[in-house]
Amino acid sequence: MAGPLTVPWMPPHDPGTPALSVVDMHTGGEPLRIVLAGCPEVVGPTLLAKRRYMRQHLDHVRRRLMFEPRGHRDMYGAVLVPSELPDAHLGVLFLNNEGYSSMCGHAVLALGRFALDFGLVPAPPSDAQEALVNIHCPCGLVAAFVECEGCRSRGPVRFHSVPAFVLATDFLVDVPGRGKVVVDIAYGGAFYAFVSAEKLGLDVCSAKMGDLVAAASAVTEAVKAQFKISHPDSEDLAFLYGTILTDGKDTYNEEPTTNICVFADEQVDRSPTGSGVTARIALQYHKGLLELNQTRAFKSSATGSVFTGKAVREAKCGDFKAVIVEVSGQAHYTGTASFIVEDDDPLRDGFLLK
């Protein structure tokens, strides 16, 4: 029997296109592909300017890493960039199957571990139980707290969100083929529409995923057409990211409440959705269903994975009353890879099946 195969060289590829080296992680089942090397410089004086530059000039990097054959329609990614904020340890641009997210909680939880393990933050004191990682996301600065032993991460990570607020409650939206549906719209670094799956004739815990995706996508498109999203800080943040279908259990309870998030181009989050948990906590606090520092558990109907969240203090976002939300979850490493492009590959920039 032949021994293990060793490959000391890269496969044939376009010498003018550097290999894209990545570390893969997941948080509650939701993937995160972190670019280590091979991405051209992302130019811009601010993080939001860098986001615009990448969309306009480097979108082939996103497509190559997120799309098939190197990824899949539910792949998620992160490109690390310098931040203009003095307190930030790193800046990040989030990649999805449609474009560029403003916030991603599952990615922040993973990046907290990654930043500590890969030496992107100062080494914590030898007796420290947690390391602070300040991550500049497109929505703002997010503080992640990473359980550690020396310079290595261990256990769960938690983060404190940007100010989260409610944009609308009980908004009546006409969903084609499904009638009039009442939704809430809240912001947790990204805007989501929230609706109980029961109002759409579905059980979020047992319905077929295709049915949940179709229903959530219909709500998203209807809200986009019938409600004007605005954000007090930047028009770059003023868009509906997706719809979160819930089990309707918004009143405080020690038992987990279940939801599923469908975002971008019908992309399904395998985790409970960190920015969605943030927005849902803000919504429950706004409605008087939750007090400060009351912890709720949120379960993904896709994988059963659980995040916890709580409102830790009140804040403001423009004229909106807001809260800072703490979200906790566990991220894991899954591997490393180097992706290449051959110059005669007609599918070099990837494709998606729908």
UniProtKB/Swiss-Prot annotation:
Active-site residues (renumbered): 104 (proton acceptor)
Gene3D superfamilies registered for this protein in UniProt: Diaminopimelate Epimerase, Chain A, domain 1
Keyword Chloroplast: no
Catalysed reactions listed for this entry: trans-3-hydroxy-L-proline = 1-pyrroline-2-carboxylate + H2O
Enzyme Commission number(s): 4.2.1.77
Record keyword Ribosomal protein present: no
Signal peptide: none
Residues annotated as binding substrate: 105-106, 269, 274-275
InterPro entries found in the cross-reference section: Pro_racemase_fam
Note, other: In contrast to the T.cruzi proline racemase enzyme, lacks the conserved Cys at position 273 which is replaced by a Thr residue, transforming the racemase activity into dehydratase activity.
Family note: Belongs to the proline racemase family.
Quaternary assembly: Homodimer.
Protein's UniProt name: Trans-L-3-hydroxyproline dehydratase
Source taxonomy: Eukaryota, Metazoa, Chordata, Craniata, Vertebrata
Gene that produces this protein: L3HYPDH
